[in-house]
Amino acid sequence: MQLTGSEILVECLKEQGVDTVFGYPGGAILNIYDALYKHSGEIKHILTSHEQGAAHAADGYARATGKVGVCMATSGPGATNLVTDIATAYMDSVPMVAITANVTLPLLGKDSFQEVDIAGVTMPITKHGYIVKNVEILADTIRKAFHIARSGRPGPVLIDITKDVTAATCEYTPVTIQPEERVTRYTREELMLVAEMIHKAKKPYIYLGGGAIISGASAEVAEFAELIDAPVCDTLMGKGAFDGRSERYTGMIGMHGTKTSNLGVSECDLLVALGARFSDRVTGNPKKFAENARIIQLDVDAAEINKNIRVDASLVGDLKKTLTELNACLSKQEHPEWMAHIMELKEKYPLKYDDENLSCPYIMQEIDRVTNGEAIITTDVGQHQMWAAQYYHYTKPRTFLSSGGLGTMGYGLGACIGAQIGQPDKVCINIAGDGCFRMNMNELATASRYNIPIIQVVINNQVLGMVRQWQTLFYGKRYSQTVLKDKVDFCKVAEGLGCTAIRVTKKEEVAPAIEKAIALKAPVLIECMIPEDDKVFPMVPAGAPISEVFDGDDLKRQS
């Protein structure tokens, strides 16, 4: 059948199972929006307050559902406003397709109104980018883009379409999309070598990253941990891949990881990295990282092997399939002395905070209790992000959504909106500091417009908390441009944008506020006032070995 480029785009989105698109219209993309209007019963479009909010929402939708998130923007500034979250998605391996429109083909390269080479701009931060100048290749390009976005190590793909292509016509033939194949690239000999190394270990440790969530390998990870009788630590991106209430779980590793995880990994004789990339935030000084251990790395991306840390063995392939095959090769191991030592570390070094005043750790524990650990938590970036990772028990994958690699302030609210749309039966809560919240708080208008029942918790300490913490510890308390004590009333802002607002100043007010917000089934902002000097501990100084992890008690003893 003969269809316009815009109609072909919509039909291809339907082929891919797309049910929601996040975006913002403009001149160059009008034809596409006209086609979406005609199919509004099949594809829901969420109009955000800003294109960056659309990209963050598509990102959150993808992380919460495992599907490809889709965002759209017009040419020029519309397209460039997507860039920050395209980079966010790239760093965190999120499957996303960003669709932009550009000026007509005769105007390309002439500095035309709202013309930007968005494919060139995003080349370093996408898995692939396309410029479509011929309607005949549009359908095939869209199908390739979705395949690339979700296959292997997922990531964002950009499709830039000139406006004349969206109006031109050609023959469209529908196709049936086949599921992605789970691929492995190791030999039987390599698999057996890894199994042998595991069998010889006396003090094994499992280091879990986001790849375990992407591949859907939680059940296989749990079986692996039981088989080799090992403790499990995770990264920010790996939260929820392993049951956070399990006795084997020791918390995060790295800069704000637990003492147990950091000291335990420093003592282990075998470290097995599952879908983890040895980020600098995890390893600290790479020359001193797990220096007593042999290291095995399982990852879908061959480029990650030996990139940051030299390993002794590796298996490249889809983690779920790899672990299924590896588990079948293993006999049950028992390490009672090692596990007893880890339990002693857990008992000796529990996470601690000052519970005299209202604090973010207390707030997170109350949210955990009220929601029974079953909410989807999104965060922005900073102290609150670490507290949200430390003090909420994540028991299932795709329940902690955060910008890990890029560290994008302003990410959480849009991501929470996307997650709520993708998982409408879940309670979705965004945790943001007052600094982060300012960056994209206009997306409360989006939540209000569609009555998306997200809960926005603002941890208000009136400072840029994480930067201030570094200024306190390492910069002689010179608080350069980190004080935010101004006249912004976040509750009034929320109410002005059509949301319910609650201010919390006492510990006993936290649980009732969360319970009320959940019961309202409408967008709610909860502003929580906490002291400006609260700090995130434990902590590893940048570049130091993770064995040098310290907490507030250590600082008091030194002073």
Predicted segments, located by residue:
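N-terminal alpha/beta PP-like core and its mobile active-site loop of ThDP/TPP-dependent enzymes
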Residues: 1-330, 366, 370-373, 453-456, ...
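Hydrophobic, well-ordered secondary-structure elements that form the walls
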Residues: 295, 367, 379, 418, ...
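Phosphate/pyrophosphate-binding active-site segments
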Residues: 174, 292-383, 507-508, 516, ...
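A short acidic, glycine-rich active-site loop
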Residues: 46, 180-184, 403-406, 476-485, ...
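Glycine-rich phosphate/pyrophosphate-binding beta-alpha loops
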Residues: 27-29, 76, 93, 156, ...
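Thiamine diphosphate
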Residues: 114, 449-542
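Active-site diphosphate/adenylate-binding microenvironment
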Residues: 6-10, 14, 18-19, 32-37, ...
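Catalytic phosphate/nucleotide-handling subdomain of diverse soluble enzymes
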Residues: 411, 415-453, 459
